[in-house]
Amino acid sequence: MTDAQIRSLIGRPPASGAWREGDPVADRLFASVGGVDLEAGGRIPSVRVAYETFGERDPDGGNAVLVLHALTGDSHLRGPAGPGQPTGGWWSGIVGPGLAIDTDRWFVVAPNMLGGCQGTTGPASLAPDGAEWGARFPFITIRDQVAVQAALADALGIDVWAAVVGGSMGGMQALEWGVGLPGRMRRLAILAAPAIASADQIALNSVQAEAIRMDPAYRDGDYFDAADGDGPHRGLALARRMALLNYRSPDELNQRFSRSWQSGISPMGDEGRYAVESYLDFHGNKFTRRFDATSYIRLIDAMSSHDVGRDRGGVEAALASVRAATLVVGIDSDRLFPVPDQRLVARHVPGSVDGGEVVVISSDYGHDGFLIENEAVGRALARLLDTPA
């Protein structure tokens, strides 16, 4: 662990790592998009979306590209961390001048998703009664999140996106755009995402949510007034540790850590630990300083709800409604959303730019390969964006 990493963990974790009203705005822009009626019932009476933009918009808006983040991402595609922005840009090697999504050519819009905790309305936001929503924040689905993104597009005056791009949970949303709003994009990129959440994926999500709920400090979601160190950081960190095991591959963990000891102290007793355990601890602890526990629960519940075929005649029928030129990318070592998940999509969308095949990227990094393998991912995205549509 580096000195910089150690400094980032000094002090007790906050009750919630969410961006809160009054925090530095950083590069966020905000749009109020009104209320949203939810697929599972209920209504959020007022939704505000935090988003960032990159590049210049053409007068006719024809160069607008929507980029959708993964479960624990945010609107900060590129740029440094700083006050109000706990992490650096998560796709700085893909989005920017001269890069695959070239901001000298494209106007990129990146929103924080509904239910998130970096500026868009979610559990850490204030409800109409002036208190945090907490666990009162209603159950939401991928379709609800896309409805809010579509409302943002309306507010920005963007009728048709040049492309909608998403990876992981963002890829679920991008596919829902293609199925549910087929006339609103010309190109579509689905990276490391399925058309439907499997039983295996739902099971993984459920144990993460339970880890948070079993933390006594969770207090049924009513923890926002807790002092630093007294919030549900243990449960949230444990959920993050569970998730990391599916974000990375066995080969990478074995190559990086093998059976090495942390700090040279033998783990064959009560004092020492394996280095891989320390790695998980570090990332769990770090995560609690930038995320909210109830937001995490609501978002993984939304992932589990994902099924583009629900009430549409099944998955294959739903995929057949996609009209955009479509790129589907998978990672060969992905054990969260393995390549067969992407093959189902590629074979049934009519506009596949690869003849119904998946672009399979070889990577030791598992699911996170779509965030790390910039050269291969960038090459595929650039090809899609150069496709006439």
Swiss-Prot record:
Record: residues binding substrate: R240, D368
Gene Ontology CC terms: cytoplasm
This protein's record includes keyword Transferase: yes
Enzyme class: transferase
GO molecular function, one term: homoserine O-acetyltransferase activity
Keywords, alphabetical: Acyltransferase, Amino-acid biosynthesis, Cytoplasm, Methionine biosynthesis, Transferase
EC number: 2.3.1.31
Protein's cellular compartments: Cytoplasm
Gene3D superfamilies xref list: 1.10.1740.110, alpha/beta hydrolase
Any one of the GO BP annotations: methionine biosynthetic process
Residues annotated as the enzyme's active site: S168 (nucleophile), D334, H367
Function: Transfers an acetyl group from acetyl-CoA to L-homoserine, forming acetyl-L-homoserine.
Protein name: Homoserine O-acetyltransferase
Organism: Clavibacter michiganensis subsp. michiganensis (strain NCPPB 382)
